[in-house]
C-alpha cells in the first residue's frame, strides 16, 4: 500500500512523500483490536491536546519530559516535514519528531542536549546531511502492533526525498 503525505509550505505546492507500507506486516494482536483505520500523517498544532494525553501515558513514571506546546510549534515552524503522528481510528497513538543536523556538528560523540540545542532546536540546519530523530513513541495500549514501523518507513522515505546521508536517533532517559 502506497500512502502520500503532503506538507504545505508558504504558498508553494509543498513537499510530498510517498511511503510504501506494503512490507509492514500485522500480527494477531492487531487483528483482535478491531481497528478500522490507521493513518500516518503530518502533525498539526491542533493535535497538541491529544498528543499531550499520549505523552502523559507514555511517560507515566512521573517524569516531566513532555514536549511543550511551544516546542511543538517551533518544530512545526522550522521543519514541518519532520513531525508526524500515527492515528488509529481518529486517536493519536504515536508520534515521531525530527530535525536535520550536519554530521560534522554532532559526529558520534554528542549528548541529546547538544544535538537539540537544549530542546530549543536551534541546531536544526535545513542544509544539514543527517535526519536526526529526537522522539518516537507509541501509546502503551497500542504497542506490539508494529505501528512505529510506519513512522520509521516515513523517515526513511523523507531522508531519501531530501537527499540526506543517513538517519540518527537520540532519546531522553527520564530520571537519568
Residue ranges and their predicted role:
Residues 4, 13, 26:
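Cationic, low-complexity basic patches in intrinsically disordered or flexible, solvent-exposed regions
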Amino acid at each position: 500500500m502506497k500512502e502520500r503525505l503532503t506538507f504545505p509550505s508558504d504558498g508553494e505546492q509543498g513537499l510530498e512523500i510517498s511511503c510504501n507500507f506494503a512490507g509492514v506486516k500485522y500480527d494477531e494482536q492487531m487483528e483482535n483490536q478491531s481497528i478500522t483505520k490507521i493513518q500516518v500523517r503530518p502533525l498539526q498544532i491542533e493535535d497538541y491536546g491529544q498528543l499531550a494525553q499520549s505523552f502523559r501515558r507514555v511517560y507515566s513514571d512521573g517524569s516531566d519530559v513532555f514536549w511543550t506546546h511551544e516546542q511543538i510549534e517551533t518544530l512545526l515552524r522550522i521543519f514541518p516535514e519532520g513531525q508526524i503522528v500515527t492515528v488509529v481510528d481518529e486517536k493519536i497513538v504515536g508520534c515521531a519528531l525530527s530535525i536535520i543536523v550536519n554530521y560534522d556538528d554532532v559526529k558520534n560523540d554528542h549528548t541529546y542536549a547538544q544535538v537539540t540545542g537544549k530542546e530549543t532546536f536551534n541546531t536544526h540546519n535545513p542544509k544539514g546531511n543527517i535526519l536526526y530523530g529526537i522522539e518516537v513513541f507509541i501509546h502503551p495500549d497500542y504497542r506490539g502492533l508494529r505501528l512505529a514501523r510506519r513512522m520509521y518507513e516515513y523517515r526513511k522515505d523523507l531522508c531519501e526525498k531530501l537527499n540526506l546521508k543517513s538517519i540518527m536517533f537520540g532519546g531522553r532517559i527520564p530520571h537519568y
